[in-house]
Amino acid sequence: MVKPCWRIGAGMERSKINPTKVDGLTWYKDLGLHTFGEFSMAMIQANSVMEDQCQIESGPLTFNNPTVQGTFVGVYDGHGGPEASRFIADNIFPKLKKFASEGREISEQVISKAFAETDKDFLKTVTKQWPTNPQMASVGSCCLAGVICNGLVYIANTGDSRAVLGRSERGGVRAVQLSVEHNANLESARQELWSLHPNDPTILVMKHRLWRVKGVIQVTRSIGDAYLKRAEFNREPLLPKFRLPEHFTKPILSADPSVTITRLSPQDEFIILASDGLWEHLSNQEAVDIVHNSPRQGIARRLLKAALKEAAKKREMRYSDLTEIHPGVRRHFHDDITVIVVYLNPHPVKTNSWASPLSIRGGYPMHSTS
């Protein structure tokens, strides 16, 4: 019998009125309230152990300036194990608040420093665990973070998760991608790597009809993946499939996020932040159309279901049959998927009517069979 167990993270909201819930392999919160509107979030497990994590933090964004209020949203798509994505969920928001407190504001530099410090500390953890758990060097995570504050939305990304804005236009809605992705199958990412490593003919290798960095990984930026950042981990007892045949002198992968800043307008309805498991099956426009044309309650779960229906269709099977497949085997049909939909009020909430601080973590399942 499948027993997914979802552990609630520290500080996680446990409202009796509108709690987070679990239904089989799906974790969700159908509707909640953040500083500037409503939100919906959902996750579904495909791997034998859930590698995705997510969070939403709403309220003060600094420790010392109560006027800096906003909403932080994070989607962390782990690979090689759940350790890196869990580490990000534990650490990146406190680091963002720390650096924002130093400057008494949110900025691109503050967010980038939070990414860098999180990666640095995770690599320290890998170093400490190397003697007893060397495979931690092969664990990493994409990191997508959004911050809504002072009429601006900051989107920072390492890896291939995606943030898409739904903007009202001529009676409908138009998809506006806010994030920049780092995947070797994108021409821009390949050009970047070739320019950074001009003397390395194997920096990118085509394998099974997909481009991979050094033939092993598709993402070109990430948190973790120490074996591609520090040569000291490119040796035994790391598994042979992760060891590179040649020595390297500078990091192959970067943790530097691409950051975009968008000033919100009354036409901006919502933002969808999701791991690439969603975008493998839904286009940007398909996703925003679903959100625009559907009730808010449970919208994140509705997006999950739409993606799973497409995954089943591609494999010429029924959706109901797909839902019966156990984790691990299920990964052959779709990835772990995380979706957060953040609705935007046209006019920011006034200072004296801010919602209570909110902290919700999604993830931490420990799947087992018995």
From Swiss-Prot:
Compartments reported by the entry: Cell membrane
Q: Keyword rRNA-binding, does the record have it?
A: no
Cofactor(s) for this protein? Mg(2+); Mn(2+)
Question: Which reactions is this enzyme annotated as catalysing?
Answer: O-phospho-L-seryl-[protein] + H2O = L-seryl-[protein] + phosphate; O-phospho-L-threonyl-[protein] + H2O = L-threonyl-[protein] + phosphate
Which BP terms does GO give this entry? Answer: negative regulation of leaf senescence
Summarizing the function annotation, the protein's role is: Dephosphorylates and represses plasma membrane H(+)-ATPases (PM H(+)-ATPases, e.g. AHA1 and AHA2), thus influencing negatively plant growth and fitness. Promotes the apical hook maintenance of etiolated seedlings.
This chain belongs to which protein, by name? Probable protein phosphatase 2C 67
Q: Which organism is it from?
A: Arabidopsis thaliana
Q: What is the lineage of its organism?
A: Eukaryota, Viridiplantae, Streptophyta, Embryophyta, Tracheophyta
